[in-house]
Amino acid sequence: MGKITFYEDRDFQGRCYNCISDCPNLRVYFSRCNSIRVDSGCWMLYERPNYQGHQYFLRRGKYPDYQHWMGLSDSVQSCRIIPHTSSHKLRLYERDDYRGLMSELTDDCACVPELFRLPEIYSLHVLEGCWVLYEMPNYRGRQYLLRPGDYRRYHDWGGADAKVGSLRRVTDLY
């Protein structure tokens, strides 16, 4: 079980809301979010209701303003707790529909293009665990939650293009 607290103002001030499960519409509880405290679990935040828009991965810790979670604004309108798993494995493909060169990953990768010599990833298959895909190396840029399943095209994970800069396993240990 996880617990996250949203605050309307910076530095954990103003009205707050405690959440312990997925919530498709946080607008019912607050109009803006400028700081967050994650007491337990790993969470994915979304800038719009129903798990839409920019995504932000948070793990246990304090985030005194939205820049600390790489937010673009004070808009957090839905959230999802990410289940903990002990093993992680995914396969990356250079073409859509699992075609072309395939590479397997079981650990974090700070620079996908450098490690696999693939400039773009068009499809992937998450076999075990949850992952966060970042569009830029070193865990920067837009973030996308990858749950176990098939992603036949980059649109399936919400990407605007096939850029994959880095991948990180969702664990509460780093």
Swiss-Prot record:
Domain Beta/gamma crystallin 'Greek key': 2-40, 41-83, 88-128, 129-171
PROSITE patterns given in the database record: CRYSTALLIN_BETA_GAMMA
Connecting peptide: annotated segments: 84-87
SMART domains: XTALbg
UniProt-listed InterPro entries: Beta/Gamma-Crystallin, Beta/gamma_crystallin, G_crystallin-like
UniProt keyword list: Eye lens protein, Repeat
Disulfide feature: none
Protein's GO biological process: lens development in camera-type eye; visual perception
Signal sequence bounds: none
Keyword match Iron: no
Molecular-function annotations in GO: structural constituent of eye lens
Assembly behavior: Monomer.
Domain notes: Has a two-domain beta-structure, folded into four very similar Greek key motifs.
UniProt similarity note: Belongs to the beta/gamma-crystallin family.
Function as written in the Swiss-Prot or TrEMBL entry: Crystallins are the dominant structural components of the vertebrate eye lens.
Name of the molecule in the record: Gamma-crystallin A
Gene: CRYGA
